[in-house]
Amino acid sequence: MNAIHAKTRPYRVGMIVPSSNTTMETEIPALLQRQSAVDGSRFTFHSTRLRLRHVAPEALQAMNDAAGDAVDALCDSQVDTVMYACLLATMFGGKASVVETGQRLARRANYMRAAPVSVVTSADALIAALHSLGAQSISMIAPYRKELTARVTATIEEHGIVVRQAVSLEIADDVAVGRLDQQTLLSMACELDLANSDALVLSAGVQMPSIEVLDAVEQLLGLPVLSAASASVWALLQKLRIEPQVKAAGWLLRSSCAHANAHAHAHAHAHEERQAA
């Protein structure tokens, strides 16, 4: 895929975020700025917030119910894409909720619009990203209470991906999640037994910051490492038909050229080992 370089204005990215979220409006622009530094694509960011103070089932359902009106508000500014940045609100209801929410918001975004608007949900994005990596089994770290993490686990497994390990940080206060030290995630990841995992979801929550350590964790562990934020950016770039070229954000967002170089390096290393043997 190549960027549509003939575009004369920046891509307008609309974001729907929980009212207590302090992370996605930081991490999504940061990742896309790295994309811009490589290919010159330009983005502007426009957000609306839905009330969520504590992560609880009734609050998550209320968010989902209000998401359609939030889409309308964003589309008034003629955005090119809408990102619904609340993974748990969508995954809480299982696979059916993931599918229904994505379809419902896409219909709302494109009802009587002059130009098509693509819709990305963080839940759909994470599932699609894992499938693109060929991950059949994963481990993940989530900020939620165990019963909520179990819902996310069940939804991922409904999509045909086995969750080998799911670490719950047991934090109910969403603002507190946004203050977590990313270096803590690095330490936690290194303590996991990943022998039977094809990938690690370092942050299975849009509020838990992680992008500054994604690459470091991936290099230490030797398997793909992603987050709700990196998966959301990957899906957004797919919708806009832009090849991901985001540096220092893990395998998922590297360019096809970087992938080819990595494969060539691995092949050469294996050849050297055979020669030495």
PLM region descriptions:
Residues 11, 41, 118-135, 189, ...:
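Hydrophobic structural segments
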Residues 101-172:
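Conserved beta-alpha
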Residues 227-260, 272-277:
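C-terminal functional extensions of proteins
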Residues 191-195, 200-201, 208-224:
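Active-site/ligand-binding-proximal alpha/beta "capping" segment
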Residues 67, 71-119:
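Glycine/small-residue-rich loop that forms an oxyanion/phosphate-binding "nest" at active or ligand-binding sites
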Residues 14-16, 79-85, 139-140, 197-205:
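Periplasmic-binding protein-like
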Residues 68-72, 181-193, 209-214:
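A short, acidic, amphipathic alpha-helical segment used as a generic capping/interface helix at domain edges
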Residues 1-69, 144-181:
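N-terminal glycine-rich anion-binding loop in soluble enzyme alpha/beta folds
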